[in-house]
């Protein structure tokens, strides 16, 4: 009888894991559970907020797609996990038994600053991005000060930088940039830290970009409150300061959703309810449970004065998904080989008229290679990659062999590595 793998989550991590499993093992029973009926291309959510993309341009409906690849799709919220009984219970009360479980839910958003959820905007979901788009129309009609940034505990800083620079470009195009003072406030110890201690010359590059575009910045502070007309932050000396604001966009922090917490403290990290995994992204206690994506508990790479987390970018998530799929299939086939993701990353930050290209191998130091470049070519590269990735989703193969070969030739990157000892922190070398 075929083994049954249940994947919770229909984002990059869930889709990539399901497709990798299907391509590695055609007779495997796979069920994907997601409360969203679509796959959304997260890196394009800033563009959706700016009105540069339509929702249908960057999303793919899952119900007609997944059955084509013999993957059952359940469009419901997963309510709870019983790791001892090997079951997932959905919102309707349906109990689904599994042999292996992959948790790729994505995070629960935590709007930790007072008034953040009510008075600010976000670009972390398609729905939030569309709401932000409406708020921007109000700003264009009645310009005033803009404040963008990240609250304490954030691990995903890139979109905030991208959004600030894209908004500068849009305001300039509309001829109203001179009416909009812009300030960037972040919990990072310095600009371009990104939660990973910087990537090459990222500090200098981002500081130069902001200086050239007249965007003021305040780093190493904790945003405490966001009110309709101002942002209140606290410095390291405990002093509070205010910055006037007509429009704000602040990245929230992340924690694991309730379904992860329901599995208990051996699956959910008590501190943040993220999935506890080892180097091979397997839960150390329940060996048939794996984590993929933002919901995995990767420890911070360094202690910062204001708490920051480690980002999990698209390329990192694809590598997690590939490693997990190989590990599940090898376990089914009684093959002792285990794999860990390399956790290297290509990040392209779109600035509107040009873009920044960042490559870190691996993301978690010490690194073997780092590349930071900037130019109009990177802007077009990101647009092309968006279309390419959505093509991969529609065609049931997130990891085509030619892509792996291209990365190996040009960047000397191998997405996964054979791991003789999985019992270590995720991201640590085997």
Swiss-Prot record:
Keywords noted in UniProt: Disulfide bond, FAD, Flavoprotein, Membrane, Nucleotide-binding, Oxidoreductase, Quinone
Assembly: Homotrimer.
Similarity remark: Belongs to the SQRD family.
Gene3D superfamilies listed in its UniProt record: 3.50.50.100
Localization in the cell: Membrane
Record EC number: 1.8.5.4
KW Chaperone (keyword) present: no
Binding site for FAD: 9-13, 34-36, 42-43, 105, 294, 314, 382
Cofactor note: Binds 1 FAD per subunit.
Cofactor(s) of this protein: FAD
Membrane topology recorded in Swiss-Prot or TrEMBL: Peripheral membrane protein
Protein name according to UniProt: Sulfide-quinone reductase
Function: Catalyzes the oxidation of hydrogen sulfide, with the help of a quinone. Consecutive reaction cycles lead to the accumulation of a polysulfide product on the active site Cys residues; these products are released when they exceed a critical length, typically as cyclooctasulfur.
Keyword Membrane: yes
Disulfide bonding pattern of the chain: 280-422, 419-430
Residues the entry annotates as binding a quinone: 346
GO biological process, one term: aerobic electron transport chain
Substrates-to-products reaction catalysed: n a quinone + n hydrogen sulfide + n H(+) = polysulfur(n-2) + n a quinol
Gene Ontology molecular-function annotations: identical protein binding; NAD(P)H dehydrogenase (quinone) activity; nucleotide binding; quinone binding; sulfide:quinone oxidoreductase activity
Active site: 156 (cysteine persulfide intermediate), 347 (cysteine persulfide intermediate)
InterPro entries in alphabetical order: FAD/NAD-bd_sf, FAD/NAD-binding_dom, NADH-Q_oxidoreductase
Gene Ontology CC: membrane
